[in-house]
Amino acid sequence: IMDEKISHPYERRYITLTNYLARYNLDAAYRIMLMAHWDTREFADQDLNPENRFLPILGANDGASGVSVLLTLAEILHTLPPLNIGVDLLFVDGEDMGKTGDPEKFGLGTQAFAKNVPEPRPQFAICIDMVADQEQHFPIEQFSLQQAPEVVHSIWLLANDLGFPQFENRMGNAVMDDHYYLYKYAKIPAIDIIDF
């Protein structure tokens, strides 16, 4: 558990961000990281109904879906521990606190984590976000391709080989998600699997 006390990005108060890190096969020098944010937006500023824009969102897809994947992986890794590589599962807070047009107020938990990444550091990271839509589409996110092209190509090729057409071999949007901040502040190549 990693707590970081910060100033709220828009209010005159302090808040505590809490990140959770689970590490498997800690002795392995070669590590990979999978990450997801567990927080949800404090307000539904993109809601189609203006009356709902000051209400918090439930976060079943944006928040809980990536966490569900990581918790499932945690169960698998507990039963079948990795032998040749280390695996880190990072659950970050404060991803969704920003406002449109203010990119440095997003990914706050990842920004805090990136300042103190424990050794041994992962060789790359995979961020999982918004993966629970009934009609999933995972195009290649633009920052992912810039930061970690080999990882993108490997994951999308593997998904194609395994018969997952949701991983679309086309360019998607540039999304300033946690992977962006992990690379920006810790220089860990990171990709984003996101339906956005």
PLM region spans:
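Extracellular/periplasmic catalytic domains that process cell-envelope and extracellular macromolecules
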Residues: 13-16, 25-28, 81-84, 118-120, ...
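Acidic/histidine-rich catalytic neighborhood of metal-dependent amide-processing enzymes
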Residues: 54-150, 174, 178-179
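Active-site-adjacent substrate-binding region
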Residues: 3, 7, 124, 133-196
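Glycine/charged-rich beta-loop-alpha catalytic/anionic-binding loops adjacent to active sites
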Residues: 45-56
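Structural recognition of the beta-strand scaffold that forms the well-ordered cores
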Residues: 21-23, 31-35, 59, 88-91, ...
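Solvent-exposed loop/turn segments at secondary-structure junctions
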Residues: 6-9, 26-28, 38-42, 94-98, ...
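A non-catalytic alpha/beta surface segment that caps or lines the substrate-entry region
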Residues: 1-27
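Sec/Tat-exported extracytoplasmic proteins
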Residues: 24, 42, 74-81, 91-93, ...
